Amino acid sequence: MINFLISPEAEFETEDVKRLVQSQKVIYALSTGSSFDLNALIKTAKQNNFSQPKKNKKNFFQLKGAKRLFPWQKPRRRSPRELHQIASDSKSVDKIIIPVDVFWGKAPERQDHWVKLIFRDSWEAGSFLRNLLKVIFNGRQASVFFHKPLETEDIFSQKRSSAHLVLKTDRLLRARFRKNRQAKIGPDISNKRTLIHAILNSSSVKQEIKLSSNGSKKLENNEKKKAYKYALEICSDISYPVIYLYDKALNWFWNSRYDGLEILGIEKINDLAVENSLIYTPSHRSHIDYLALSYELYTNNLMLPQIVAGKNLNLPFLGRILRNGGAFFMRRSFGPNRLYSKVFFEHLRKLFQRGYSIEFFPEGGRTRTGRLLTPRPGIISMIIKSFQDMDERNVKFLPISINYEKVLEGKSHLKESRGQKKKKENLSSIFSTISDFRSYLGNAYLQFGEPIDLKSFLDKHAPNWQKDLIDLSEDTDKKSWLFEVTPLLGNKIMTNINKATVVTSSSLFASSISDISDKEIDKKRLSFRIEVLKKVIETDKYSELIKLPNITSDEIIQKVKKLKFYKYDKPKVLKISKNEKSLMEFYKNNILHLLILQAYVMYKSRKKIIKNDLINDFLEIFPQIKKDFFIEISLSNAEKKICNILENLKKINLLKIDSNSEISWSDNEKEKDAAGMFASLWLESFSAN
């Protein structure tokens, strides 16, 4: 009935195969049980005068997919009845078994329409409806691939049982089909299909089910169902067609709404990926952080990571899209649910052991203030536990700083920072966020920080980690070394993120208006403030990775205007309303860690202070500053650092230090104005906590 939709092309592994398919001794072995695939083969044979597959001739068979009675059971492979008949026939040694694959649709890079791409072949087993749509949209782009024949003489001349011959032939065919499919559509990266069985059959999950069921078969089956349900809830389901659509959509997004997504440091990641398992740990400032990293890895031909996402994002429609892009879902709290905990951990461990790259946000959720949040220990602890089981010890954490000149969620961040209760994620909240897609959003930056080698870190901070092994069946939180090293690693990740900050135009502008709102400000005054901020960051930056915008202060002011952060604009002055200033707090906080030490100095010196008194006061408060702002400077180097800052502030005339070591602000009005800006940065940040 639908044959008119199918216009297949014949492809051959070798020229000899083209000749062999005309022989009446041919037996076709199709890779699937699909009637559409069989129709494509029949039509190809008729068009090219090949031996035609017919039931009465018994000259074809179709391999069947593995089936299980219940999802949590081990799948059972079924061999075709026709293959059993061939194995029982002594004349089969003269037959020519030619494996046949049918592919629907072009490769992603050659596809001419996104709908056709969705319904092209992939590793996922399709329903009848999906297969029908595949034929409707890609029937005229079908190809029938004829493999080299099996060595039937070697197989069927052996004096073995027919059951053994069936099993051997079945395995040879499936291996051939899998290799060819991988070459045609890429490797099977759908961990949902390949990992669930391994998770459910892991010793820790089976042991937990056994303990929970107390010897009751009924309870055991119920626990198995629960475990399967949890695994389905957790696992990702990567899809090449969806990833291709992601690529097209995101390419448009970054280059139309933003002035592109600039990635820094990707070259070293290409080198690291050859020898290491990679764990990506980005800062989390926007919903689109999920997409930014995956997009850049995809365009740079690096393995797509498996992304840890909160279960709150597992929404209808959206959850499916995120799964197809590599997200797997994690509940906010495991609570007393030991079975869920075991299933989740085994899933993470299997990904880790099989060499997948993993991405998670150490902060757990998006920052609403713009400052990095305290890292959550859960995933970090699980990764360390998994690491003990690995034979391969090359694992690198990759801290990543993601910085935007404008985030999509600015208004919701403002409401929540003012005390409004955080709203539960739903489709309406997501769509209200992306409504700002129509606006100009400036630049976005993604910079890789200094990698952290996990083995080296553990060797330094927990020397006995290889000897003090973790028994997964016990309460691992009681391991003191694990309890101590987990927050240390989390803080190191956050510190390396801060060391890779890309300073944006909006963050400099926001810092420059820290003590100004609801009044006009001269643009020249504002421009001078921004120049001072740039100079201070450049002079005292504690990492060479920290980047500043390569545009003038006047251009920064104009860009912030273009981003619609302020409305009142005249040739020589502008005015920031209280609401506009509040909206920009987020961006000021993005770079506060680069200015907080100078802000402290300027605040303390607003009244004359002896240098040694300032240093002593600073050393007392510095541990708290270091903790809150994830600053790299060690406690032993703190005094040296503050002395350098004092000298640098003196050089740019913000401070005076007289012969009696008395520190005070400059007498110059412009410099005194800039000093007030720094002092207000301190007042609005650290002292408010």
Predicted ranges, named:
Residues 1-689:
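Membrane-interfacial terminal anchoring regions of lipid-handling membrane enzymes
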